[in-house]
Amino acid sequence: KLAEQILITVNELLTAKGLLLKAGTVVDATLIAAPTSTKNKDRARDPEMHSSKKGNQWYFGMKAHIGADAESGLVHTVRGTCGHVSDIAEGNTLLHGDETVAFGDAGYQGIEKRADATPDVTWHVAMRPGKRKALNKDNEADAMIDKAEKLKASVRAKVEHPFRVIKRQFGFAKVRYRGLKKNTAQLVTLFALSNLWMVRGKLMEAQG
C-alpha cells in the first residue's frame, strides 16, 4: 500500500496547487513485456504474466491500465493486470468518482453499457478506425462527426504522455520482478514520479 499512498500524497499536493483537476478522465492501457525465458530457479515463466495479441504481434507480460486527468494528463489511478485482460474490463475501475466525462480509444466501445458503469459519467469513445475511414468528408453530417473524432483524439493524446515518461525518462520498458503485486507497486510509484516530472516547471515557478 506504500506505493498507492505515495501516489495519493503527490496528487493531493498537485490538487492543492490547482494542477490536477477532476472534471474528466482519460483511460488507456499498455502492455509491458516480461521475460519469456525459463532459465531461472523455477525453470518456468512467471505464472502471473500472460500472452496478449496487439495487432498481428504476440506479447508476453502484464498490462498497465491508467486513469489520467483529461485536462493535464496527470495520472490518478493505476491498475496492473495479466497481459490478456482486455482494456474495457478495467475501464470503469480507472475512474476516481468525481468526473462527469471520460474518454477512451476504440477498445473501450460499449463501456457505458457494462454492469460496473457509472450512470453519471458520459463516455466519449473513439469510433472504430474502419468506421471512421468510411466517413464521407464531403457530407456535412459525416464531416461534423470526423471533427468530433479529432477533438476526442486531442484529449486522449494526453494519456500517452505519462506512459512516455515512465518508459523514456525512467527507463521502464519491461517488468523487473516476478508477480503482479511488486510490478504494479513499482508502476504506481513511477506514475507518481511522472506526475511530478510532468509539472516540474510549474512547481519550480511556484517556489518562486
Predicted regions and their residues:
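Polybasic low-complexity intrinsically disordered regions
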Residues: K1-P119, R128, V188-S194, R200-K202, ...
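Helix-centered, glycine/charged polyanion-binding patches within enzymatic domains
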Residues: T100-V101, A106-K181, A185
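Hydrophobic alpha-helix feature that most strongly marks membrane-spanning transmembrane helices
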Residues: K167, G171, W197, G201-M204
